[in-house]
Amino acid sequence: MKPVVWSPNAIESIQNSYNYIYTKSPQNADLVVKTLFDLGDKLNVFPEKNPIEPLYNSKEIRFFPKWNFKIVYRIEKKRIYILDVFSTYQDLKKIKF
């Protein structure tokens, strides 16, 4: 099984989401972050099952949706690399992987 590696950008995005949610509900912020990390860490179990990210239309770049978030990742030869985690409320054209 390939290891899952989180990009610095993905970690920063989760931290930013946590900070935003925390202002409204600290308990929900903890739940969201824990769930996103848990799901991301399990992407190495059949990573091809998730849809191809339409912004890139590359079979290597896929996403896992959860609530209003997308975990975007790339399937590489030796690892699963999580590129970013973002809210689907964001303007997708501003997202850079």
Predicted regions and their residues:
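Basic, Lys/Arg-enriched alpha-helical interface segments
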Residues: P3-N57
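Generic alpha-helical secondary structure signal
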Residues: Y22-P26, E60, K77, K93
